[in-house]
Amino acid sequence: GRTMVVGGGFRRKLVLYPIAADETNRPGQRLTNWVVCAKLGDSTTPIPHKDDWSRRADHGEVLELVDGELHTDALDLPALIRATEDVFVYPMCDRDPLAQWSFGRVTLLGDAAHPMYPVGSNGASQAILDGRALADRLAAGGPVEAALQAYDAERRPATAAIVEANRKGGPEGVIDFVEERAPEGFSDLDAVAAPDELRAIVGDYQRLAGFAPEG
């Protein structure tokens, strides 16, 4: 479980990592989570109908997205896809940042307030930060309405910036950055991009999201 693969770019991307071993029933095998992301529309594309938000996919549908686009030396990706009994399709959508969250004694939090593309591990993370900020404001005392407005003013601009950053790939935008410089591939990453350039992309996102290491 120490290895994670994130490959491809913003148009096609593979996320792959082992979860657990089952040495009793399936020796040498691992329960593995894999995701194939494919950009199939843009900001003008209508949001899918509700019935399409979680549907079973045909294996051939996924293999077509992978063919000639994604591969890893770590394993046989087409074989992994074929071996997966149930494959599901989920649309990846977000919403434009809202102008207001708090209305009187009612406010929004988490995905209800800032649905965003699932990159950078920020869906639940930002909801936790929302909850902490809201609890801090309410614990400070004073009118509830004022506490909710203060929470709104603290969290809404921060999460709006993350929504916008995730549209550009979030921290995984480092992959697109390298691909743009070396579209035909490379054998020496340092010859394509300086380590400081790559660290800056990831570090800027960590600071934006609020989980950069302190110190």
Predicted regions, residues:
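FAD-dependent flavoprotein oxygenase/oxidase catalytic domain
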Residues: 1-215
